[in-house]
């Protein structure tokens, strides 16, 4: 999945041949892994020690080395773009050149944007209780429902609200003192807002949109006081629509080629299929790495699971 994300983003952000260069692909993957590893280690470190610890982490040195090599690979492409000017590809690099002439030759900026674009998502396809209708997959209708259900059951735990002053919440009356922090993802566990909030339901928001007045609410990239995965207000993620479309396109590509199931479904077909619990590590929520997801090509279903 991570490689698929890297290939997809690279194609959007910079055209071939660099986007299909194996060394470039490996660099984007390694840089993403190093970044996540550093973030995980730093999240468990006292804030006062983080500036010192960061310099001694081996992954920090790896990131510096990876960034330097990425600059070297990107330089010929950027120089060719600046000289060419005509018949150039329509990608992120060209967009920066066209819209930010003062930074068009900033190799560090271009490299950072390319490397920091890589991101990944989910293994919840295997738990869908009924198959996704192919025509609706093309329309991305059921795809949106799946992703909305995933976003609710796996909220962004690194997003916190800190009170800068004492706040009194009237109903129920509760005083929130200055300096307190609240995990915004906890709103998705509130049973006064959601039915069976801790269970995964890929069609939860489809049902909610059937209620009059909710027809346009609860979209995957929506932001509101009850939908905080992408942030809220001026702090909402500006790239959420691009990211959501990217995820949808990748899953459509996977569903059109493969089918998925958990390994325990194969051994016990009569058992009720349950989604394996997540692994929570600090601010990170991850699929259980010990869970085996079986994949079979739809092109030849007789070959068995791979």
Curated annotation (Swiss-Prot):
Pathway info: Mycotoxin biosynthesis
EC number in record: 1.-.-.-
InterPro entries given in the database record: Cyt_P450, Cyt_P450_CS, Cyt_P450_E_grp-IV, Cyt_P450_sf
Highest taxon listed in the record's lineage: Eukaryota
SUPFAM superfamilies given in the database record: Cytochrome P450
Residues that, per the record, bind heme: 237
PROSITE patterns: CYTOCHROME_P450 (PS00086)
GO molecular function, one term: monooxygenase activity
A GO BP annotation: secondary metabolic process
Keywords on record: Heme, Iron, Metal-binding, Monooxygenase, Oxidoreductase
CDD domains, per database record: CYP503A1-like (cd11041)
Family classification: Belongs to the cytochrome P450 family.
Free-text function comment from the UniProt entry: Cytochrome P450 monooxygenase; part of the gene cluster that mediates the biosynthesis of aspirochlorine (or antibiotic A30641), an unusual halogenated spiro compound with distinctive antifungal properties due to selective inhibition of protein biosynthesis, and which is also active against bacteria, viruses, and murine tumor cells. The non-ribosomal peptide synthetase (NRPS) aclP is responsible the formation of the diketopiperazine (DKP) core from the condensation of 2 phenylalanine residues.
Entries under PANTHER family matching the protein: CYTOCHROME P450 (PTHR46206)
The protein's name: Cytochrome P450 monooxygenase aclO
Classification lineage: Eukaryota, Fungi, Dikarya, Ascomycota, Pezizomycotina
Encoding gene (name): aclO
